[in-house]
A protein has these predicted regions:
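Conserved Rossmann-fold NAD(P)-dependent oxidoreductase catalytic core, especially the SDR/UDP-sugar
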Residues: 31, 83-141, 145-150
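Conserved glycine-rich Rossmann-like NAD(P)H-binding loop of the short-chain dehydrogenase/reductase
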Residues: 30-40
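Mid/C-terminal beta-alpha module of Rossmann-like enzyme folds, strongest
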Residues: 2, 198-261, 275-314
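Substrate-positioning beta->alpha
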Residues: 95, 159-160, 178-200, 207-211
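NAD(P)H-binding glycine-rich loop region in Rossmannoid oxidoreductase-like domains
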Residues: 39-105, 117-121
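Flexible, glycine-rich beta-alpha linker
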Residues: 125, 146-163, 218
């Protein structure tokens, strides 16, 4: 697709998913305006863009005036901003509303809002609840917005698969919380391509909600087993009973660097998979990248002898 005349404002473009979304947009020729609270975090994008194709702005999504200024003159607006800890209401609800209202006021042709599987205004989890309320705020301000709900994202820079791999490298035994909870990991580059397609083709995708998952559904335990095998770290896995996991989250979740917060524990009580009948990556004509197809390339760094090491017979 050729989008050389399009201006796309990308909120959160300096983050994990932002990296892949920006790259997908660059390939179309679009001019990308990255709105980032800490602009330096987006510096890595400059070598990836053509001359004059990238602009980086200092914007706090909570600042309505700054958000309005960022979207002025935009053809497309994309909101990738999300947090796992902190003030969910300010970021996922008020911030999302600010972006949607500004996009509508600016006359943007499309708005893509990235939410998450599990978004539900009635969720036990404050994270899931804020994501659901944020979707409602976006729909109210910009009815033709495209909402994307990905499952857990994986990619070279992720904090999910890499976290397990780091634990397997250091710990002699790995505890497993909510081992039966199911996930449908989706490659961040696939999601970035879906975001790009939705932003540049609003006629086909505007006003719709998609749930994005990969080709495999794995339990938490199966994911950890796979990481141990791929990294050659045959660690014993110990299932933590739910009452004990609940106690750990309650007692230590408030501490800095806690392994799991109470809200994350609540999120683990629900499967993180695409709903039956939901439209997904196939609606964008995109294949689903298997976890093993790309992750082994970077997980070899966690093996004792790098890429020359054999896999564990775990």
């Amino acid at each position: 697709m050729d989008a050389r005349d399009r201006v796309v404002t990308l909120f959160g473009g300096g983050g994990f998913l932002g990296r892949y979304t920006a790259q997908a947009l660059f390939r179309t020729g679009a001019r990308v305006r990255v709105a980032q609270r800490h602009p330096r975090r987006a510096n890595f994008l400059h070598p990836l863009a053509a001359v004059g194709q990238l602009q980086v702005l200092a914007v706090d999504i909570r600042d309505r005036g700054a958000v309005r200024a960022a979207v002025r003159g935009s053809d497309c607006v994309v909101n990738l901003v999300g947090i796992l800890k902190g003030d969910f209401e300010a970021i996922h609800v008020a911030g999302a509303r600010n972006v949607a209202e500004a996009a509508a006021e600016a006359g943007a042709g499309s708005l893509v809002h990235v939410s998450a599987i599990g978004a539900d205004p009635d969720s036990e989890s404050a994270y899931g609840r804020s994501k659901g309320e944020g979707e409602a705020a976006v729909r109210a301000a910009f009815p033709d917005a495209t909402i994307l709900r990905p499952s857990i994202l994986f990619g070279r820079e992720d904090n999910f698969i890499n976290r397990f791999a780091g634990m397997a490298r250091l710990a002699p035994v790995l505890p497993v919380l909510s081992g039966a909870t199911r996930f449908q990991p989706v490659y961040a580059a696939d999601v970035g391509r879906a975001v790009t397609a939705a932003a540049l083709h609003p006629r086909g995708h505007g006003g719709r909600t998609y749930e994005l998952g990969g080709p495999q559904v794995l339990t938490m335990r199966e994911l950890m087993e796979w990481v141990c095998e791929t990294t050659g770290r045959g660690r014993p896995l110990v299932d933590i009973p739910d009452p004990v996991g609940r106690l750990i989250a309650r007692a230590t979740g408030w501490l800095p660097g806690a392994p799991i917060t109470w809200d994350q524990w609540l999120m683990l009580r629900r499967d993180n998979v695409v709903s039956p009948g939901a439209e997904g990556l196939e609606a964008f004509g995109l294949p689903k990248t298997p976890l093993a197809a790309v992750s082994e390339g970077w997980l070899t760094s966690y093996r004792r002898h790098g890429r020359f090491a054999a896999k564990s017979p775990y």
